[in-house]
A protein has these predicted regions:
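Hydrophobic alpha-helical transmembrane segments of multi-pass integral membrane proteins
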Residues: 1-267
């Protein structure tokens, strides 16, 4: 992804490709989204979600199939893009990636069903929700391909697709996993020498759960409204949604700083 991006930058001044750099922007974006973000999140999620659920479920062969299907889909997309095949051919790589996501969803579902921890906290719920939210850009992409094939490009669908990728499952798993991992990291840094000398705070007490809940509500409401505003082209809805997402970001940063600036306390 980095090499392609660098080549596209040089292509602005020195012709390296047959077309201008903007023509290859879609290829570069999907190499980053699928080849980097998606594989990274699935890799991290496949380890952290079962771990925090305290689940005994494991299935390495299924995860290998997820990995293979995603990479096959990405390679097929790059081939079709470079050779400018008809738009309906793009349904094949979409089908491969969709199958991979369904398999990963099955993996997470089995991990959830075989969990030892029966009560699931809000942070993990958001992380699990991010897995379900992966379906939204896939659905929009299928609609977008069919629309492009039948009636031409639909800018609103393109914008909604991009938004649901970056502000959907990517943002959701970051919001959830931040408050599952960061408190443990800071707790270990602050209290690793004090453990056993007295009662120390629980890692989950290093941040405000009420603020996290408020952040989650603002984020999900803002996300739904923003997608609605894009599809309906209603500026007022977009403005309200942007405000809600901004407030969610403020609460997120407040809680993160609360964790980072935590001072030692023996109870």
């Amino acid at each position: 992804t980095t090499v392609v991006g660098l080549l596209l930058v040089y292509n602005f001044s020195t012709p390296l490709f047959a077309e201008d750099s903007l023509h290859y922007l879609s290829l570069h974006a999907h190499m980053g989204i699928i080849g980097w973000f998606l594989l990274l999140i699935i890799g991290v999620g496949s380890r952290l979600i079962p771990m925090f659920l305290i689940s005994k479920y494991t299935n390495a062969s299924l995860l290998w199939w997820v990995y293979i299907l995603i990479n096959l889909g990405l390679i097929a997309f790059a081939f079709m893009f470079l050779y400018m095949l008809p738009v309906y051919f793009y349904l094949l790589p979409v089908a491969a990636v969709t199958t991979a996501l369904l398999l990963f969803g099955y993996y997470c579902r089995q991990a959830y069903r075989q969990r030892l921890r029966k009560q699931v906290d809000e942070q993990l719920k958001i992380s699990v929700l991010s897995v379900l939210m992966m379906a939204l850009p896939v659905i929009l992409l299928i609609i977008m391909i069919i629309s492009l094939w039948v009636a031409g490009e639909n800018i609103r669908l393109v914008l909604a697709y991009g938004f649901t990728v970056f502000f959907g499952w990517i943002t959701a798993i970051i919001l959830g996993m931040t408050f599952k991992t960061l408190p443990f990291i800071i707790w270990n840094k602050v209290y690793h020498k004090k453990a056993g000398l007295g009662k120390t705070p629980n890692p989950k007490n290093l941040f405000s759960n009420r603020i996290f809940t408020g952040m989650a509500v603002l984020y999900l409401t803002g996300f739904v409204l923003f997608v609605t505003g894009i599809l309906l082209s209603v500026v007022f809805i977009l403005q309200i949604a942007a405000l809600l997402l901004l407030l969610a970001a403020v609460l997120y940063n407040f809680n993160v700083m609360k964790i980072i600036l935590h001072k030692p306390a023996i109870l």
